[in-house]
């Protein structure tokens, strides 16, 4: 990096489970210009100051969802966050509400298991390729299109106070994906997903703070998906009560 670049102090959370009792912060002096992302800055630290710094990243384009972390206590993607917005310094921490494995790397096992549990794929559609494309109208696609933009970054879980209180809550992304498929005209698997949504750790754990939608980097609006999920859950309950046994 050029000598005439600006410099900023970055407080970065460090934690090595083999040597540290608890996470701590180390301050690094990092050069930056108008185009330097937080991910670039972390790369500078790793290449020049702390080779043992651990963090996740991949695409650099807000597609893979790998580089989520807390930036001044706000969940953000490092690749979409720019150092020019933090001229007075910045504090970087591992993604909130997740167990820390090392430095900025968190254990996302429960997150992945929650996504798997709601079966995020089309179910019950026996249409054969020989029958041609499974067409949808624009109106049918509009029902789920926004919810299909989720990149599984986990920022909504870091923002969710209920997930912080109850780590068994399946969470915003899982419920959003369930709603994405439940509202897809090609899918017939809502009945298989409803037990997850109706359960103790399903949609009714949400108290509708709405912060999950504020931090979503793809504007998926998981808060709206959860409220739709509550309506579907209530309808499912009423139908079950009235249905003859």
From Swiss-Prot:
It is found in: Cell inner membrane. [4Fe-4S] cluster binds at residues 150, 153, 156, 216. Its EC number is 1.3.5.1. GO terms for cellular component: plasma membrane. [3Fe-4S] cluster binds at residues 160, 206, 212. Its cofactor is [2Fe-2S] cluster; [3Fe-4S] cluster; [4Fe-4S] cluster. [2Fe-2S] cluster binds at residues 59, 64, 67, 79. GO terms for biological process: anaerobic respiration; tricarboxylic acid cycle. It is an enzyme of class 1 (oxidoreductase). Residues 13-98 form the 2Fe-2S ferredoxin-type domain. It catalyses: a quinone + succinate = fumarate + a quinol; a menaquinone + succinate = a menaquinol + fumarate. It is a peripheral membrane protein. One of its GO terms (molecular function) is 2 iron, 2 sulfur cluster binding. InterPro entries: 2Fe-2S_ferredoxin-like_sf, 2Fe-2S_ferredoxin-type, 2Fe2S_fd_BS, 4Fe4S_Fe-S-bd, 4Fe4S_Fe_S_CS, Beta-grasp_dom_sf, Helical_ferredxn, Succ_DH/fum_Rdtase_Fe-S. Pfam families: Fer2_3 (PF13085), Fer4_10 (PF13237). Binds 1 [2Fe-2S] cluster. Keywords: 2Fe-2S, 3Fe-4S, 4Fe-4S, Cell inner membrane, Cell membrane, Electron transport, Iron, Iron-sulfur, Membrane, Metal-binding, Oxidoreductase, Transport, Tricarboxylic acid cycle. The keyword Transcription does not apply. The keyword Phosphoprotein does not apply. Fumarate dehydrogenase forms part of an enzyme complex containing four subunits: a flavoprotein, an iron-sulfur, and two hydrophobic anchor proteins. Two distinct, membrane-bound, FAD-containing enzymes are responsible for the catalysis of fumarate and succinate interconversion; the fumarate reductase is used in anaerobic growth, and the succinate dehydrogenase is used in aerobic growth. Belongs to the succinate dehydrogenase/fumarate reductase iron-sulfur protein family. This is Fumarate reductase iron-sulfur subunit. It comes from Proteus vulgaris. The lineage of its organism: Bacteria, Pseudomonadati, Pseudomonadota, Gammaproteobacteria, Enterobacterales. The gene is frdB.
């Amino acid at each position: 990096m050029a000598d005439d670049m600006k410099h900023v102090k970055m407080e970065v959370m460090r934690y090595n489970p083999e040597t540290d009792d608890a996470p701590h912060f180390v301050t690094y002096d990092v050069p930056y210009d108008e185009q330097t992302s937080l991910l670039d800055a972390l790369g500078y630290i790793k290449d020049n100051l702390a080779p043992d710094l651990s963090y996740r990243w991949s695409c650099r384009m807000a597609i893979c969802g790998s580089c989520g972390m807390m930036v001044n206590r706000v969940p953000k993607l490092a690749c979409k966050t720019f150092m020019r917005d933090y001229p007075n310094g910045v504090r970087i921490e591992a993604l909130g509400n997740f167990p820390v494995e090392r430095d900025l790397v968190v254990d996302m096992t429960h997150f992945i298991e929650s996504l798997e549990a709601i079966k995020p794929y089309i179910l019950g559609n026996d249409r054969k390729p020989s029958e041609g494309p499974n067409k949808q109208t624009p109106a049918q696609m509009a029902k789920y299109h926004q919810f299909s933009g989720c990149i599984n970054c986990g920022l909504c879980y870091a923002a969710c106070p209920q997930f912080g209180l109850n780590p068994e809550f399946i969470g915003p992304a899982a419920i959003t994906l369930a709603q994405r498929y439940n509202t897809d005209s090609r899918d017939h698997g809502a009945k298989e997903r409803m037990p997850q949504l109706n359960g103790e750790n399903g949609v009714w754990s949400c108290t509708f703070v709405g912060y999950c939608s504020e931090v979503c980097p793809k504007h998926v609006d998981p808060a709206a998906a959860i409220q739709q999920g509550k309506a579907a859950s209530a309808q499912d309950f009423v139908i079950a009560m009235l249905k003859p046994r």
